[in-house]
Amino acid sequence: MSIRSSLVVGFTGVALAAALAPAQAQTCQFLAPVGGNGTTNVITKTIGAGNPFGRPNWNTDFFVTQPYGSFKFFFTADSSVSATYPIQGYLKFTDGSSLQVINESFAPQMGTGRMWGPFPAIPGKTVSQLNFKIGASADQAATGFTYRISTMGCN
C-alpha cells in the first residue's frame, strides 16, 4: 500500500469514527418571561387589537440571565379556528441593539406549533432578552386568536 493510499484510508477512518461518535447532548433551560408570575415559563395570550390609549399585547420578552450558546423559540396555536399568525422574534442585546431572527406568517392547526432555532449567540454581543412579537397592526386578521409561547437558552 502506498503512502497516499494509507493517508486516504486513515482520513476516511477518522471521518467515519467522528461521524459515528455520539453527539454531545445540548442542555437547554426555559427562560422566564418578563412580568411573569414565576409559576410558568409558558405564556398564553390572545392577540388583541392595537389602540391609541393602551399597549397591545403583541410583544413578550423573556429574561436571559446567563450566557448561552444558542436560543430557541416555541409557538403553539390554541384557537379553535385555523388562523395565520404574523410572528417575529428578536435577540435583544445589552447595548440596546437587537437582531431579528424570525419574520414570517405561520398558519398551524389548533394544538400544533413550531420551534424556531437554534439561533447561535452573536460573538462580541451579550443577549439580555428574547422577544416574541405575535400579531401586528399591519395584519388585523389574527385578532382574537389564542396561542402559547416559550423560549429556551441552550449550551
Q: Whereabouts are the PLM-identified features?
A:
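Short, surface-exposed beta-strand/strand-loop-strand elements in extracellular ectodomains
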Residues: A83-V101
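Exposed aromatic-hydrophobic patches
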Residues: T112-A121
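Noncatalytic modules at the cell exterior or secretory-pathway interfaces
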Residues: F73, P120-F145
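Solvent-exposed serine/threonine-rich low-complexity stretches and specific carbohydrate-binding patches
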Residues: L99-M110
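Bacterial N-terminal signal peptides
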Residues: V9-A19
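Bacterial N-terminal signal peptides that target proteins for export
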Residues: M1-G10
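Short, surface-exposed binding/anchoring microloops in extracellular/periplasmic proteins
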Residues: K45-I87
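Sec/Tat signal peptide C-region and signal peptidase I cleavage site
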Residues: A19-T27
